[in-house]
UniProtKB/Swiss-Prot annotation:
InterPro entries: DedA_domain, VTT_dom. Belongs to the DedA family. It is a multi-pass membrane protein. PANTHER family: ALKALINE PHOSPHATASE LIKE PROTEIN, UNDECAPRENYL PHOSPHATE TRANSPORTER A. Keywords: Cell membrane, Membrane, Transmembrane, Transmembrane helix. Pfam families: VTT_dom (PF09335). The keyword Transmembrane helix applies. GO terms for cellular component: plasma membrane. This is Uncharacterized membrane protein ML0467. The chain crosses the membrane at residues 10-30, 55-75, 147-167, 174-194. The keyword Membrane applies.
Amino acid sequence: MDVDALLQSIPPLAVYLLVSGVVGVESLGIPLPGEVVLVSAALLSSRHDLAVSSIGVGVVAVIGAAVGDSIGYAIGRRFGMPLFDHLGRRFPKHFGPGHVALVERLFNRWGVRAVFFGRFIALLRILAGPLAGALKMHYPRFLAANVSGAICWAGGTTALVYFAGMAAERWMERFSWIALIITVVVGIIAAILLRERTSRIIAELEMEYKNRRH
């Protein structure tokens, strides 16, 4: 079975369930590659020989993000900040003091806007819901920022990838694979540099946290 035949054998419903499930669980506070799954599904929707709908992908991603964040909010509100102390000891790579301190600082600086813009930042996307609940953010304000952020993030990402996928097909007809590879490499390098900068900030905050405790 070739790749095209394999892709055509995937039921659209399975794609929609995967997108909503992974995005929802990530929004709940569990580190999963929600954005990777969303981008992959959006790329599938850009192929006209497949039955996956770009609108369907965007809608289920919005639902998954909004519901997952709300569940995360409820968990955070129920267990409070001790929840993050426990998770930090169990999973320091994702919930260490530096991670929580960075997100809490952004919440203190941006308020409810951190929920909206957090949808576009991996670390905030995971922690925004539970931390908003733990900090007792007013739920209607949280919900408004949560839903609007989910619509902009999921809808915007799906539309961008969908049109980029169609443009890439036309681009490869006119130019070459080399130009496309160069573009992808530049994008990967930019993502790595941004990730390293975030890691440095987290490391500094963790050191600051340890110094305060001593």
